[in-house]
Amino acid sequence: MVKFDTKLWKAVLMMSMINIGLSVVNVMFKKMIDEGLNRMVATTYRLAVGTLFLIPFAIFLERHNRPKLTGRILCSLFFSALLGTSLVQYFFLIGLEYTSSTFSLAFSNMVPSVTFALALVFRQETLNIKSNVGRAKLLGTMICICGALVLTLYKGTALSREHSTHMETHTRTDSTGAMTQKWAMGSIMLVISIIIWSSWFIVQAKISRVYPCQYTSTTILSFFGVIQSALLSLISERSTSMWVVKDKFQVLALLYSGIVGSGLCYVGMSWCLRQRGAVFTSSFIPLIQVFAAIFSFSFLHEQIYCGSVIGSMVIIVGLYILLWGKSKDKSASVTKQEPLDLDIEGCGTAPKELNSTAHQVSAK
């Protein structure tokens, strides 16, 4: 009789809900940027809303089981914020502005493979190429890279001509050469953002184990992200008028993206990282593209291109070959339990008593 793994399906449901929420955030951000809102100003407001939303949860839900907050933990969270909030948003939003919502999220399908490659480098995963499992992992990773090259180098024809209003507007204002150059630059920015985001999964997975209070850690991470994003905003443009948000849709979108995107979604991902590891958590990221494509096609009237479809299909095939190998890798659970090399003063690995208490905290 097959045993029903409650914790596994709880994590699956959690990541599915997170990806729906993040896909809506992506579509909203695309619309706000197209309307002229500064990309880093939007990120700063989003993180500020998320920080204010999470403070009460961090204070009241984790006041009895919060470990000592040392200087090294704060430094680790500052670095995590740099990877997971400010820098990744900076590069991703440039790519989003220069391409489309659907295309930009097609690149997110690379996250599991890049995360797996980084996990190998940092010894969070193992790879034995002499076994079928090891070869499946390697093959899946290589197929994902090939799919990413298709996305970058081949745009193809539009598959949704009846919904071409959005791209026609850009075509009228930009020459074909300029559009091609912007699309290529956007693709490069998206690749950089994916590498940064994948690195965040590795870093945050370690932090979540030595400091398992996801509300507190996410609140601090968001606060650092506010400071970093504000500085990036001031470096790129110093006009005070860019901080004024008058449009009602933009206000509502910033509130939603802060509460859901930077608040609940990051808390949920921190919980899943601690429970299931970086590769499992990142493997659900391709779902964002599916939901975002539906929302973008319906509300933003974006084109869907042949290259995006082919590249995405190749990446997804590679992804699930990788996941098959991951699921068959019996040593994965042993690897996750190995001592962490993240040297955080006063913590080390999280005590058993702390972990058992932290499991009671809801990630909702």
Curated annotation (Swiss-Prot):
The chain crosses the membrane at residues 9-29, 41-61, 76-96, 102-122, 138-158, 183-203, 215-235, 251-271, 277-297, 304-324. InterPro entries: EamA_dom, WAT1-related. It is a multi-pass membrane protein. Residues 26-152, 195-323 form the EamA domain. Keywords: Membrane, Repeat, Transmembrane, Transmembrane helix. The keyword Protein biosynthesis does not apply. One of its GO terms (molecular function) is transmembrane transporter activity. This is WAT1-related protein At3g30340.
